[in-house]
Amino acid sequence: MAGRAVRESIQGQPFNDVLNELHAHTFSGSPGESDPFTLAELEREYIAYALALYYQCDHCQVYHGKVIDRLRAAAALADWPWRGEVLKTVLYLRTSKGSVSAPEWAGWQESWRRFAGRIHHRHPGLACAVAYAVGISRADETLMDMAFESLRDRFPDPATLLGVVRDIDRVVVFMKAATSKNRTDPILRRQLGTCGVRV
């Protein structure tokens, strides 16, 4: 019986083991090791999906999209075109204060608040959490401050707020690593292949 070929990792198995452990600490938890989560798994997965769109990682979009579909089905949630809404959220967040004039920024903020409020009625706090994640991912202090105000209003208890910020930050850190790896591995394999190296 022929065995199935297993593709060797470019980074090596120990690195992949660390990345898998980081995934567990970010999404499912590692019993006895992970801090408890404040945001629900579905919320963390929505943030991951948004970052997959933001970083343009097709693999991550497929993976986290399937997880969201599974979690939504398990919770028997009402139909909602969440993919389109998360996509619109990411498109909104591609604008930064430094790239537009002061009147444009004021108009953007007003429009964003209306849009985020509409999303809030379907999934409370989602647009704000995604905005905070995108702000962290590009070190956009203005966006982070704006989103943090909303987070602080939604989670007035300092310990809960800290948990929310930790959960969002962990998703950002994981997704930065995972999307980079998933987007560049095919390029690295192609380049190494030109030298006869197969991984």
Model-derived segments and their meaning:
Residues 1-199:
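Hydrophobic alpha-helical segments
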